[in-house]
Amino acid sequence: MIEFRGLAKQFGTRIVLRDIDLAIVPGRITGIIGPNGAGKTTLMKSILGLVRADCGDVVVDAARDATYRSRIGYMPQIARFPENLSTAELFAMLRDLRGDTRPVDQQLVQQLGLQTYLDTPLRVLSGGTRQKVNAALAFAFTPDLLILDEPTAGLDPVAAGILKDKILEQRELGRTVVITSHILAELDELCDDVVFLLDGTVRFAGSVHDLKLRTRQFSLERAVAAMMTAGAAA
């Protein structure tokens, strides 16, 4: 389980997270949703240790220290790769850094068509192919927890479908997925639960079904729009 206990973060005079108390249920797919600037990326990066909270704790499976991070697969919205390496060299470098001799998920590499680019320098890959490499890295080494930031951005429909199937497969394997996307129809398809952030606070945390019931809407997109309208009027 991922727990946020009194988490707060401020950048200069801008308050990004306000006293977040939240639990993310293990073995489920949870979407972090909200408008731009709501604190979604900051919340996700706090799990990874890429953002340090001003106060409060992030606890993963009862661990407050950084030991749990070796069990995380992370797919950033925009990946930064060493441009001089080939795709295969990048995979090998990460195996060495992690001290893990297991190969990258070869099935996913094949499905995404990356075998053609294993010897290609990363600097010459197209944006869509780089995003496929980004996805393969996130699922490498069979992580217990996946943090995915706009995972299908830049992917063609076939690759996006392959990736969504891979995400759904993780739930069947009992793994936890935390995902953010501006494509709410995609989250409606994938997620069991959602956390709706607005102005750095949690306005809803629960199942997608319960959010639709609460807002009396038939889709996640309309439910979120209703929450945002209600928040603006408050």
Language-model region placement:
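Conserved structural motif at the start of ABC-family nucleotide-binding domains
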Residues: 2, 17-19
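Catalytic Walker B motif of ABC-type/P-loop ATPase nucleotide-binding domains
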Residues: 146-150
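Conserved ABC ATPase "signature" region
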Residues: 92, 96, 102-117
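Conserved ABC transporter NBD signature motif
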Residues: 52-68
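Conserved ABC ATPase signature
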Residues: 121-128
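Helix-to-loop junction immediately C-terminal to a conserved catalytic motif
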Residues: 48
